[in-house]
């Protein structure tokens, strides 16, 4: 099967099951697996929107304990004996009585070969409606606060009627608004410079009640939620909308005076720990989101990231490298503990930063990364980037249910040939051991079950596996054996019930050693994304240069293993079609903002890495290797061009998409004509149309992008052109003279002033090292 046909097949599997695998044939021995270099991994998007996924209105048929795998198309069914055989533990299970009428031609939907992904609406209802708790920073300029208030009031109309909603505001103090009290505005005030234990918060808010003691039966689910003490602070939208709108409208800038040489006092840490304490008491394991809107860094109390004096700058990457960090370790520990508590309770924390300065995302990143929350970094709450990204969180499906899932848990089962080594993505381990758990660890390992809390249709997780068998495949098998994995995602649907999405994947095991089927089954795009997740995971704990060396070493080893070459002859080096782009992806990953922190603040690095760990293969590839399209007079529409400095031409317009930025770049001549106003003159309609075309294409790119990218229009030689130049392969630098691609293009291409090596030089070194056999 040729590469294009295989790619199409993998695309169909991704559309159907939300899964891309690095290897689509599994090696049959551990020895063979170790020679693959790139681990066996799956990038899985559990809630991938798929209109034709059947929603079954009954509980699934499961295998007996401890296996608990779910009936799926790969199960053998004995219709006469009314039995099914589990492919994971090989035990025989009786079919339930209501399946008595099945025949070889009339099978239930979960056994249908095309239903490898299926969703069940479980009979278990959610313990409470979804909860939304807004935590709002009032130390902001008037215009920013006014824009934020407008967005918050508008968002109330996007929430389901029965959802519970509450408000905490903070500045020098933190205030919990009692929206259930209608006589006058009433709030409980917490000191901003004091650390409150969970118990203190609960006592001060009067939340301690006997009904919610551990071990007591939970109240029967249903509407409306019973009026416990927490209902003074969290009320259904239908009841609280008027009170809450009034409370938000009346929000004023924090009254605490701020001297000219000081930052405003902000107790972000106290506000968050009060929010966590409020939900923890009454709503443990009920789906809820704490949404933090931060207009600046925490400057007092637990979790402070910078002192109040303006002459003391907030930490940079350089400070962290030199260990010149006064507050970092303490703040990180505080927020990480808060993240653990929140994840344990099944709640999600979103952070919206609306500030030109850093707000402390580096310290707070665990709050989002452990709970599946969103992280959105903008310059101000007045920006369309914030407003539109915020609205997109509340997108709904055809039945008017929010597209977000709450309180989610992912379990992975494997057949005996495979073991799961870990997960990289926004989740925490539930420390559940099973026969599916491997000996080694990659990412969050030593478990087969993870808790994600917040999950949405684009949440994607990198799951890594190892091969368990020491010996080879059994020689007497007629048909190839299959290795299998099953993903079980339990989550609270916003309609009020728990759902279970089941995806079952089976792939052939390779034949005897040296089976060419393994190399042909390599999906270079999925592999690049799975490897970049490992690199970013390593970058969080290791030194930058060490991670780059690891990326290089793995690439050299992969090429040495799978390329065709004569030893010590770089000119003979050839890669198969499904490997040719992989070195290029690694070249751009090495230069990307995920691994190179130069020119980015620590907050930006935390934000970029957070988004990479949330997206699927195609979006992650855009982040690693941005797309570049060129527009000029003698062609129809945009044409994809090389991400290379030779693509900059005076009479061309370029459209760059890095996922985080969408940039329109006018070549020198085009910019001069535009400044001269030719597009407004008669007879130059084609020039006006040329200027419009990239804008229209950019609009299409923005429509379903989350978070909303920053939109930049710039000219060759302008200061904003740096966004493009930093992403291009520098094949024409001040040292290289004419371009490496040669020809006319290179003569008129822009020179890039950089000491970075070009892709061509990188490939030359790679070939030399791969064929030398010393790796």
From Swiss-Prot:
- Which parts of the sequence bind Zn(2+)? 63, 67, 86, 89
Any coiled-coil regions, as ranges: none
Q: Which InterPro entries match?
A: ADF-H/Gelsolin-like_dom_sf, Gelsolin-like_dom, Gelsolin-like_dom_sf, Sec23, Sec23/24_helical_dom, Sec23/24_helical_dom_sf, Sec23/24_trunk_dom, Sec23_24_beta_S
Name the principal localization, coarsely classed.
cytoplasm
Per UniProt, the keywords (alphabetical) are: Cytoplasm, Cytoplasmic vesicle, Endoplasmic reticulum, ER-Golgi transport, Golgi apparatus, Membrane, Metal-binding, Protein transport, Transport, Zinc
Q: List the disulfide bonds.
A: none
The record's GO CC annotations read:
COPII vesicle coat; endoplasmic reticulum exit site; endoplasmic reticulum membrane; Golgi membrane
GO MF entries: GTPase activator activity; zinc ion binding
Localisation: Cytoplasm; Cytoplasmic vesicle, COPII-coated vesicle membrane; Endoplasmic reticulum membrane; Golgi apparatus membrane
User: What GO terms describe the biological role, i.e. biological process, of this protein?
Assistant: COPII-coated vesicle cargo loading; intracellular protein transport
Membrane topology, as annotated: Peripheral membrane protein
SUPFAM superfamilies for this protein: beta-sandwich domain of Sec23/24, C-terminal, gelsolin-like domain of Sec23/24, Helical domain of Sec23/24, vWA-like, Zn-finger domain of Sec23/24
Instruction: Say which family it is in.
Output: Belongs to the SEC23/SEC24 family. SEC23 subfamily.
Q: How does it assemble?
A: The COPII coat is composed of at least 5 proteins: the sec23/24 complex, the sec13/31 complex, and the protein vtr-7/sar1.
Write out the function statement from the record. Component of the coat protein complex II (COPII) which promotes the formation of transport vesicles from the endoplasmic reticulum (ER). The coat has two main functions, the physical deformation of the endoplasmic reticulum membrane into vesicles and the selection of cargo molecules.
Please give the name of this protein: Protein transport protein sec23
Q: Which organism is it from?
A: Neurospora crassa (strain ATCC 24698 / 74-OR23-1A / CBS 708.71 / DSM 1257 / FGSC 987)
């Amino acid at each position: 099967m040729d590469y294009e046909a295989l790619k199409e097949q993998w695309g169909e599997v991704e559309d159907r099951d939300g899964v891309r695998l690095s290897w689509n044939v599994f090696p049959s021995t551990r020895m063979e697996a170790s020679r693959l270099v790139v681990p066996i991994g799956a990038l899985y998007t559990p809630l991938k929107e798929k209109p034709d996924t059947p929603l079954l209105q009954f509980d699934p048929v499961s295998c007996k304990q401890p296996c608990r795998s779910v009936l799926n198309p790969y199960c053998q069914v004995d219709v006469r004996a009314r039995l099914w055989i589990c492919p994971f533990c090989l035990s025989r299970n009786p079919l339930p009585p209501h399946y008595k009428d099945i025949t070889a031609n009339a099978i239930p939907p979960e056994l249908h070969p095309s239903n490898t992904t299926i969703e069940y609406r479980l009979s278990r209802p959610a313990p409470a409606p979804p909860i939304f708790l807004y935590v709002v920073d009032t130390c902001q300029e008037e215009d920013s606060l006014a824009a934020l208030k407008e967005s918050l009031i508008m968002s109330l109309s996007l929430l389901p009627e029965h959802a519970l909603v509450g408000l905490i505001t903070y500045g020098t103090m933190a205030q919990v608004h009692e929206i259930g009290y209608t006589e006058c505005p009433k709030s409980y005030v917490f000191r901003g410079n004091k650390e409150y234990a969970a118990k203190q918060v609960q006592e001060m808010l009067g939340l301690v009640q006997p009904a919610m003691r551990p071990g007591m039966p939970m109240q029967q689910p249903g509407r409306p939620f019973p009026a416990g003490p927490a209902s003074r602070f969290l009320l259904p939208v239908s009841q609280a909308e008027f009170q809450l709108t009034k409370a938000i409208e009346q929000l004023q800038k924090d009254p605490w005076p701020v001297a000219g040489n000081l930052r405003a006092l902000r107790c972000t840490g106290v506000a968050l720990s009060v929010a966590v304490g409020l939900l923890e008491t009454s709503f443990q394991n009920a789906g809820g989101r704490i949404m933090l809107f931060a207009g600046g860094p925490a400057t007092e109390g637990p979790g402070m990231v910078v002192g109040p004096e303006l002459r003391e700058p907030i930490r940079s990457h350089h400070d962290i490298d030199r260990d010149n960090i006064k507050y970092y370790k303490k703040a990180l520990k505080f927020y990480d503990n808060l993240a653990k508590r929140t994840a344990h309770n099944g709640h999600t924390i979103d952070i919206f930063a609306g500030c030109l300065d850093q707000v402390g995302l580096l310290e707070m990143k665990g709050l989002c990364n452990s709970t599946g929350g969103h992280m959105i970094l903008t310059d101000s709450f007045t920006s369309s980037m914030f407003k539109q990204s915020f609205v997109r969180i509340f997108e709904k499906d055809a039945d008017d249910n929010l597209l977000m899932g709450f309180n989610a848990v992912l379990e992975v089962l494997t057949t005996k040939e495979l073991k799961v080594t870990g997960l990289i993505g926004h989740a925490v381990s539930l420390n559940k051991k099973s026969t599916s758990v491997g000996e080694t660890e990659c990412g969050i390992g030593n478990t087969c079950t993870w808790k994600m809390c917040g999950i949405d249709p684009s949440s994607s997780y990198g799951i890594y596996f190892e091969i368990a068998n020491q010996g080879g495949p059994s020689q007497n098998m007629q048909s190839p054996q299959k290795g299998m994995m099953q993903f079980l995602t339990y989550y609270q649907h916003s309609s009020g019930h728990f759902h279970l999405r089941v995806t079952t994947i089976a792939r052939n095991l390779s034949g005897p050693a040296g089976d060419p089927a393994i190399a042909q089954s390599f999906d270079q795009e999925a592999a690049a994304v799975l490897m970049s997740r490992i690199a970013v995971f390593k970058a969080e704990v290791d030194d930058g240069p060490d991670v780059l060396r690891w990326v290089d070493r793995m690439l050299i080893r992969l090429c040495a293993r799978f390329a065709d070459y004569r030893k010590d002859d770089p000119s003979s080096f050839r890669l198969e079609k499904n490997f040719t782009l992989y070195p290029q992806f690694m070249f751009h990953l090495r230069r990307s903002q995920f691994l190179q922190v130069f020119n980015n603040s620590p907050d930006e690095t935390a934000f970029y890495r957070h988004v990479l760990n949330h997206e699927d293969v195609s979006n992650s590839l855009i982040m690693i290797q941005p797309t570049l399209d060129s527009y000029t007079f003698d062609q129809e529409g945009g044409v994809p061009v090389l991400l290379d400095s030779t693509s900059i031409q005076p009479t061309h317009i370029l459209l760059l998409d890095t996922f985080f930025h969408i940039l329109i770049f006018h070549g020198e001549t085009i910019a001069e004509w535009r400044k001269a106003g030719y597009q407004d003159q008669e007879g130059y309609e084609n020039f006006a149309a040329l200027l419009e075309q990239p804008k229209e294409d950019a609009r299409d790119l923005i429509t379903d992008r989350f978070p909303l990218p920053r939109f930049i229009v710039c000219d060759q030689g302008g200061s904003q052109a740096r966004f493009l130049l930093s992403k291009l392969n520098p094949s024409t630098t001040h040292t290289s003279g004419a371009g490496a691609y040669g020809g006319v293009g290179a003569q008129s291409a822009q020179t890039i002033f950089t000491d970075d090596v070009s892709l061509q030089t990188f490939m030359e070194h790679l070939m030399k090292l791969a064929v030398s056999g010393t790796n």
